[in-house]
Amino acid sequence: MASVNIKPLEDKILVQANEAETTTASGLVIPDTAKEKPQEGTVVAVGPGRWDEDGEKRIPLDVAEGDTVIYSKYGGTEIKYNGEEYLILSARDVLAVVSK
């Protein structure tokens, strides 16, 4: 995973999606047009967290750089940076962290 010069704001995270499956369990090749959008990726960068209701301290996020996460299917904004595709998600769009 390469270093990226993108720093998310507040409770946003930058995720690089894992590759979608190209073949089925039975060996059938899935064309690009039929592939499901991946819902799993690696966290590349994390924002500092949003402010609490009083605006006095930041609420830390539950994810960290390097975590593998599962996120909402239609959550986030897709971006392309230096030829790589990323997704900027709100921390609320992250459904789970995958244990290694």
From Swiss-Prot:
One of its GO terms (molecular function) is protein folding chaperone. The keyword Cytoplasm applies. Its main location: cytoplasm. Keywords: Chaperone, Cytoplasm. One of its GO terms (cellular component) is cytoplasm. The keyword Cytoplasm applies. It comes from the Bacteria. InterPro entries: Chaperonin_GroES, Chaperonin_GroES_sf, Chaprnonin_Cpn10_CS, GroES-like_sf. GO terms for biological process: chaperone cofactor-dependent protein refolding. It is found in: Cytoplasm. Heptamer of 7 subunits arranged in a ring. Interacts with the chaperonin GroEL. Belongs to the GroES chaperonin family. Together with the chaperonin GroEL, plays an essential role in assisting protein folding. The GroEL-GroES system forms a nano-cage that allows encapsulation of the non-native substrate proteins and provides a physical environment optimized to promote and accelerate protein folding. GroES binds to the apical surface of the GroEL ring, thereby capping the opening of the GroEL channel. This is Co-chaperonin GroES.
